[in-house]
């Protein structure tokens, strides 16, 4: 006897009641459940029923705090995430994604980004700064701490509001190799850059903090020079203003 398939709306009703931490386990049941568990509408509906939970960071620890208000006696559960030696010195917590913690390390020379996964495995990342390219695409700048070499990548196609990032293709736009180039620190809010490619060639402008007064580094068609006493920079946005 062939088993009867549940109606899609009933399957959705079952999945959205599953605790968020356990929802990913149901992705391997079948293709339909895998697609359904990734649906943004179901995810938002599922999270709306989840107990409040937030991250608390102190100088030396990071805690996960959950609040259960559904019982007669509300409870607060505090869980030490036990990073141990990963949090030596000063760190900034940028956020979490799929159980991974994104931190910025101020302790080591030059700073740096790191990702700590649920198994407490740490991976250091190269410096990266995100910007807009041609008004409808993204560009990303990454820099090596050892050589200070800069590589700039841009998305090949336009970025739409409905894109989820799975089909985005990145191509290398420009490489800058100068040992005297300043380190780009993404923790500083005034670090910005702009790239363009037109009839005059490829252009690159970087504004970043230095020990001296802030300067704009400019590269146009292979020529690099520094312009001092720069105080602001304009970077186009993907957001359309009506």
UniProtKB/Swiss-Prot annotation:
<feature type="domain" description="F-box">
    <location>
        <begin position="1"/>
        <end position="46"/>
    </location>
</feature>
<dbReference type="InterPro" id="IPR017451">
    <property type="entry name" value="F-box-assoc_interact_dom"/>
</dbReference>
<dbReference type="InterPro" id="IPR006527">
    <property type="entry name" value="F-box-assoc_dom_typ1"/>
</dbReference>
<dbReference type="InterPro" id="IPR036047">
    <property type="entry name" value="F-box-like_dom_sf"/>
</dbReference>
<protein>
    <recommendedName>
        <fullName>Putative F-box protein At5g37040</fullName>
    </recommendedName>
</protein>
<dbReference type="Pfam" id="PF07734">
    <property type="entry name" value="FBA_1"/>
</dbReference>
<dbReference type="InterPro" id="IPR001810">
    <property type="entry name" value="F-box_dom"/>
</dbReference>
<dbReference type="Pfam" id="PF00646">
    <property type="entry name" value="F-box"/>
</dbReference>
């Amino acid at each position: 006897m062939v088993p009867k398939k549940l109606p899609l709306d009933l399957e959705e009703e079952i999945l959205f009641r599953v605790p968020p931490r356990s929802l990913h386990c149901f992705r391997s049941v079948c293709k339909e459940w895998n697609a359904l568990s990734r649906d943004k509408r179901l995810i938002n509906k599922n999270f709306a029923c989840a107990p409040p939970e937030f991250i608390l960071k102190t100088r030396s620890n990071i805690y996960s705090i959950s609040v259960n208000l559904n019982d007669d006696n509300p409870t607060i559960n505090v869980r030490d995430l036990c990073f141990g030696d990963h949090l030596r010195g000063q760190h900034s917590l940028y956020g979490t994604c799929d159980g991974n913690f994104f931190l910025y390390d101020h302790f080591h020379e030059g700073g740096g980004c790191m990702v700590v996964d649920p198994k407490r495995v740490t991976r250091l990342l190269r410096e990266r700064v995100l910007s807009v390219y041609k008004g409808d695409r993204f560009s990303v700048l990454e820099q090596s701490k050892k050589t200070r070499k800069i590589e700039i990548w841009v998305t090949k196609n336009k970025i739409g509001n409905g894109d989820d990032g799975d089909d985005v293709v990145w191509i290398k736009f420009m490489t800058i190799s100068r040992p005297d180039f300043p380190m780009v620190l993404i923790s500083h809010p005034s670090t910005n850059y702009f790239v363009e490619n037109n009839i005059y060639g490829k252009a690159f402008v970087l504004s970043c903090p230095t020990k001296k007064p802030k300067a704009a580094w400019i590269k146009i068609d292979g020529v690099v020079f520094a312009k001092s006493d720069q105080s602001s920079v304009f970077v186009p946005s993907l957001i359309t203003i009506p």
